[in-house]
Amino acid sequence: MGLPWYRVHTVVLNDPGRLISVHIMHTALVAGWAGSMALYELAVFDPSDPVLDPMWRQGMFVIPFMTRLGITNSWGGWSITGGTITNPGIWSYEGVAGAHIVFSGLCFLAAIWHWVYWDLEIFCDERTGKPSLDLPKIFGIHLFLSGVACFGFGAFHVTGLYGPGIWVSDPYGLTGRVQAVNPAWGVEGFDPFVPGGIASHHIAAGTLGILAGLFHLSVRPPQRLYKGLRMGNIETVLSSSIAAVFFAAFVVAGTMWYGSATTPIELFGPTRYQWDQGYFQQEIYRRVSAGLAENKSLSEAWSKIPEKLAFYDYIGNNPAKGGLFRAGSMDNGDGIAVGWLGHPIFRDKEGRELYVRRMPTFFETFPVVLVDGDGIVRADVPFRRAESKYSVEQVGVTVEFYGGELNGVSYSDPATVKKYARRAQLGEIFELDRATLKSDGVFRSSPRGWFTFGHASFALLFFFGHIWHGARTLFRDVFAGIDPDLDAQVEFGAFQKLGDPTTRRQVV
């Protein structure tokens, strides 16, 4: 046929059987990738430390999506929440991966069957004997079926009526587990961080989809609308389908990057805004203050802080710190977290408590500045010693640790104090193992960052595709120079231009 690479899809333009075939093959490829990727991730995943080395630190991409839908156990005998299990059941991580691969194989065979047996009676118009598709009817069927699936997911899977429920956690990502969720029918259901909204929105959207599907199955479009929107043209279907996909991609890019109940931080890592707003830092200070109010010592109050909460308050877990083109997991960047050293509290020789100013997200280097409770600069690590007046040595800064591995340890040696001041810029201080994975010390993004970048990029690409194919189908007559309602056969190329009234016509 000699088609250029960008026109190869025209081979299925008027061939419904093979159009189905290539779509089934596409589904086979997607399902096959998902299953294979899941098996690869399970082969390299280390479930031993869900607190300091969770799935998002290890760069897992498909495991979090399985987990948020209720899969927590492995045939390897481990659970994602820690500990061991004896009876994981068929729907383990490996079971889901295997199901995708089996489904992929069946789709592969179905695609071959439809490619070979492309000329089916069902595609033939009884009046003309030519292949044709009743696109408005097909739209109604698809809308109805997707509505049933949507309703079923919300009413049964999420609510636990027939299914496991979904991953639900507290606002600080400490108590996450799979549980049944009741639909939230009030205004709270519109809060993106309320899990009940997932159930209620799927039930509502599914109901709407079922009703809309039945409407499109029972009501034919008006002739003017049918012609105006080119409903008889398969490229109209392509254009509107691309619109649905790019819209969904933009939505999920937003819910992933800004955070929502559908993207728990225990599975995908914290968001950059939680670092920017000092979200975990405020909660840590609130808990310490509550401990002090109960007459606990500073050391006891800090020792009660969960290591998991302290780990979230570390800039290395900020997805915006990794460059888009730095390949590898977070563990390949700053290393595998081994333990929390504790919270450093700095004091000058007058006994004032000093706070290290934290590094903003988009800085690679940042001056070490220590301020008092009123925000007045009291100490720093100067760039030029000759002009320094707030240096650690001059001000006599000391550091003492509370909680963690160095609980109760204090340092007054200026070199050591400066070392911990630099590390305090990055949030809570952790011991990191960079030897095991030969980590290079350069921050990486989490799967939250990759997912957002990928979906935002493809959404922009698909937006262009929607405009392209929509314009092609709406203005087909303009681009081709042929009136779509032309009912006369014209001898092309025999005269100066198309539409010339002197052109010989043969009425059909």
Swiss-Prot record:
GO terms for biological process: photosynthetic electron transport in photosystem II. Binds multiple chlorophylls. PSII binds additional chlorophylls, carotenoids and specific lipids. It is a multi-pass membrane protein. Pfam families: PSII. The chain crosses the membrane at residues 21-36, 101-115, 140-156, 203-218, 237-252, 457-472. Signal peptide: none annotated. Keywords: Chlorophyll, Chloroplast, Chromophore, Membrane, Photosynthesis, Photosystem II, Plastid, Thylakoid, Transmembrane, Transmembrane helix. Gene3D superfamilies: Photosystem II CP47 reaction center protein (3.10.680.10). It comes from the Eukaryota. The keyword Transmembrane helix applies. GO terms for molecular function: chlorophyll binding; electron transporter, transferring electrons within the cyclic electron transport pathway of photosynthesis activity. It is found in: Plastid, Chloroplast thylakoid membrane. PSII is composed of 1 copy each of membrane proteins PsbA, PsbB, PsbC, PsbD, PsbE, PsbF, PsbH, PsbI, PsbJ, PsbK, PsbL, PsbM, PsbT, PsbX, PsbY, PsbZ, Psb30/Ycf12, at least 3 peripheral proteins of the oxygen-evolving complex and a large number of cofactors. It forms dimeric complexes. Belongs to the PsbB/PsbC family. PsbB subfamily. HAMAP family: PSII_PsbB_CP47. This is Photosystem II CP47 reaction center protein. It comes from Morus indica (Mulberry).
